[in-house]
UniProtKB/Swiss-Prot annotation:
Location of the protein in the cell: Cell membrane
Ways its activity is controlled: Activated by G-protein coupled receptors via direct interaction with GTP-bound GNAI3, which increases the channel sensitivity to phosphatidylinositol bisphosphate. May be activated by intracellular calcium store depletion. Calcium channel activity is enhanced by MYLK, that promotes its subcellular localization at the plasma membrane.
Family named by the database record: Belongs to the transient receptor (TC 1.A.4) family. STrpC subfamily. TRPC5 sub-subfamily.
Protein's gene: TRPC5
Protein name: Short transient receptor potential channel 5
Organism: Bos taurus
InterPro entries for this protein: Ion_trans_dom, TRPC_channel
Amino acid sequence: MAQLYYKKVNYSPYRDRIPLQIVRAETELSAEEKAFLNAVEKGDYATVKQALQEAEIYYNVNINCMDPLGRSALLIAIENENLEIMELLLNHSVYVGDALLYAIRKEVVGAVELLLSYRRPSGEKQVPTLMMDTQFSEFTPDITPIMLAAHTNNYEIIKLLVQKRVTIPRPHQIRCNCVECVSSSEVDSLRHSRSRLNIYKALASPSLIALSSEDPILTAFRLGWELKELSKVENEFKAEYEELSQQCKLFAKDLLDQARSSRELEIILNHRDDHSEELDPQKYHDLAKLKVAIKYHQKEFVAQPNCQQLLATLWYDGFPGWRRKHWVVKLLTCMTIGFLFPMLSIAYLISPRSNLGLFIKKPFIKFICHTASYLTFLFMLLLASQHIVRTDLHVQGPPPTVVEWMILPWVLGFIWGEIKEMWDGGFTEYIHDWWNLMDFAMNSLYLATISLKIVAYVKYNGSRPREEWEMWHPTLIAEALFAISNILSSLRLISLFTANSHLGPLQISLGRMLLDILKFLFIYCLVLLAFANGLNQLYFYYETRAIDEPNNCKGIRCEKQNNAFSTLFETLQSLFWSVFGLLNLYVTNVKARHEFTEFVGATMFGTYNVISLVVLLNMLIAMMNNSYQLIADHADIEWKFARTKLWMSYFDEGGTLPPPFNIIPSPKSFLYLGNWFNNTFCPKRDPDGRRRRHNLRSFTERHADSLIQNQHYQEVIRNLVKRYVAAMIRNSKTNEGLTEENFKELKQDISSFRYEVLDLLGNRKHQRRSFSTSSTELSQRDDTNDGSGGARAKSKSVSFNVGCKKKACHGPPLIRTMPRVGGAQGKSKAESSSKRSFMGPSLKKLGLLFSKFNGHMSEPSSEPMYTISDGIVQPHYMWQDIRYSQMEKGKAEACSQSEINLSEVELGEARGTAQSTECPLACSSSLHCVSSICSSNSKLLDSSEDVFETWGEACDLLMHKWGDGQEEQVTTRL
């Protein structure tokens, strides 16, 4: 295996060594290109500009070169948020490429604005572009700027792009079989799936939904549901789609959190998206948006405290302060209303709009009346099961008893209620509720019981001993079905536990456990069928007759079990009951002396018990425990969602009367029926068009009301979005904290500012500007200079020619401060430390100057500041590097006597204005001197410890003022 990595050599010293070499070598940068990228990294505007100008003339630098990290100069400027250098590079037509995507990923808003407004000038000579191969790009071809901005969820960048009217590809349906989807999947299935995931990841961005959707809440509902369904199809990316679905749910919930009044909450929850339903005046204030949330399983939205507060107010309408009452008072009130439900129902039948009729229509009263009616039905079932009315047990077709006659109206009322619910909500919505399926099964069993009793009453007359009845006698089947329906009717009462905060989570956990049991039964049935087939195959030949067994009994129900595996059905029963320990081991014996057969049978029976009891049963317990823990972790949300579904069933119009009063036609029902019959079969002529004009007027009024309601909804949504965005930005700044990136940005700002100040003070006037190829060489050169006591070591450097030579410079501030700190190299450490003690006030002034440049502070007083260079370079090294000892004494004194005000120092003056006194001439090794200056400056910048200890106060003041400005900027934009 080692031969794959190195070539075997014969000489011993390197026999146990693996020679390493770069296999995939990249093109090395030239020294000029390294210096160019280094200047961009440091923020040296003048050097970058000079390098770009020389590149246009001499072509000595490839301005599109990349560093080992694959970053071009433009990308480095974007990463450092240096907009001035970015603009300079764009003016020289550098290759843009994925710079916009890179700026969006780095969330540099200024760079995005600059790149969006950038247009390549036509007719000019352009530098050949690189990186044209998309294989080396950091972004896949399907990623667009708006998609990447949506992935980062940067509100400001998304707003900039949306204002440019960008678009996002519309994803096809989940199970779309169009030509485009099929061909894309066949060509590259991975790219097709990834592209779909990237599109949905962009569409699920809260900022994008808030900006581009007219109804962001409904959009979040539908998108969350679609992503949940897509996670079931794209199993490979199931976790990603589920995370996006949860993100949409949380966005809708967070948006509802911003509601500040009951009016805003009502406008949101009562808004309809279906215009045909909006024109119906009777359907206002029916919580349409909340119904949509329940339909799409938006549990977080439904369980939101604001939503629950409004629902509780509507639920306890007419009972102010209900929750503050004692539980005894609540119990007595509920029992009183429950006992009075027949009278309240009769009052509603007679006069629906009376006080009692309106009282029973309240949701809480309706719930109590329906519960009392169902408890009465269960009480009658209990009376029927106890046979309080004695009848002849041997009558084959017994007539109905008094209790059964009393049960019949309730059964008919239940059936009529289910028919109305299916008619109002639709068949699809009806079958999605498991309790409706249970009601359907229960009502079907009651109908089958009634039908079989009628058949037995008509067909069979007289009495006969029950022991002599045939097995499929109608009365026997009816009794069995009635017993099963009694069980289902009693269990149906569990649905009412949802209204209680203590029993509700238990009821939800029970429902989840039933799902686990169904999953478990699939595996268990497979194991059961496998062992049943094998045991039946083994013991089929040893079946005996009933007359050969004791008491003429055959099967496992006998006192002495036998023939447990003689048939397949008997084998299935035997294995099932063996799980509960109801089968003995001797059933594996045979009358013949076939010990091998008995051993194989006993081994198979034991293996089945180990698998079913030890493995499968414990797996079922673990699954049920997991389901319960999942509900317990989200007990509050799950219970509130289930309770809301229960409450919403009583908020709707209709279904006011409980069984059996709901089967009695009311006067209102006769009125509705008469109007329908009159309009359908006896249409009246309208020669004058009065009815048509009346319908047009009413339609216009309803449409106007709909527009007003929609306008109010849009105003509320606009306010919610503003509050949400403000809270999102505020939370992101709070959670961001102080990171390493902040220190890097601060260091970059200080470096750029240093070069700007050097240009302003006129210290960068030499003919040649030298740069080392790496920061390591710079630091090594500084160490060499310090140790040699002024001796200059020759090192390789790269120079950019400066076009203009100036004979005068703005140097007096620097020269006035230099003698003060000492120009000799022989100073002691104590003296040097004392000389640095006065640097604090200078740094404070430097911070004020920096704030002034950034526009966050008012301009300070324009009094002269002569110690600005103390915070820029260390005076000792500057003095040592420049070697002013070689200068003429008269010229130095003349320069030291000149004064200049810092507020008057500008870049144009530094480059174009000449002073009356000439600056000192450069030494013979001026190129090397300037390189040493850069070494000192680089050493200062690379030492983060010195920077943050010395410039602490100014940086703190700078960051404080910058933070205040950012908050004001965010508030202004919002």
